[in-house]
Amino acid sequence: MFKILCSTGALLGKSNNRDYKLLKELSTKLTCDGFEFMMYTAWYEEVEALITALKEMQLYIPVMHCEKHIGEAISKGEFDEAYRRFDINCYIAGEIGAESIVVHLWDGITSDAHFENNLAAYGKLKDIADKYGIKLLIENVVCNQEDPMKHWCELKERFPEVHFVFDTKMAAFHSQMDLLY
């Protein structure tokens, strides 16, 4: 029932130019049940090549993590760009067989300074994810105004169907680890 997933973000970074082609070799060196595929901004230029490469690798990828600037765009009120990028991320997720997609609903320097933008955007993001048959998961990202748990409660109140993913590093930053139990 439970699976141990490795984030591809732990394997691909600046030191190896975030070369997704390295996943084929690197994935064989790990003992895990599957992967959370982490999307990066640089890959928007080559979406089809990315999808083809991932399919050829035949990795089990039940979860995709959206490119992190989506939440920052939402926070800044750049909704059209955020929705465009999120749609691309959902398309990729669907093509590689992911069942769920993680998004930072707020992020960057703006973070949760305009949480009303982030709250307003959730419904549209959910509609886009639903179009691809993918479950949307909201991560407890670090805040610079309030805290993630407060925002999760606001989301749950307004959207009872919302699903979350709990990042222990983010929770520790806000001293919210105990709230999981």
What residue ranges belong to the model's regions?
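Active-site groove signature of glycoside hydrolases
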Residues: 89, 93-113, 137
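Short glycine/serine/threonine/alanine-rich loop segments
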Residues: 59, 98, 134
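N-terminal pre-domain/capping segments
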Residues: 1-90, 94, 130, 159, ...
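Short, electropositive alpha-helical surface patch
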Residues: 55, 60, 114-127, 153-162
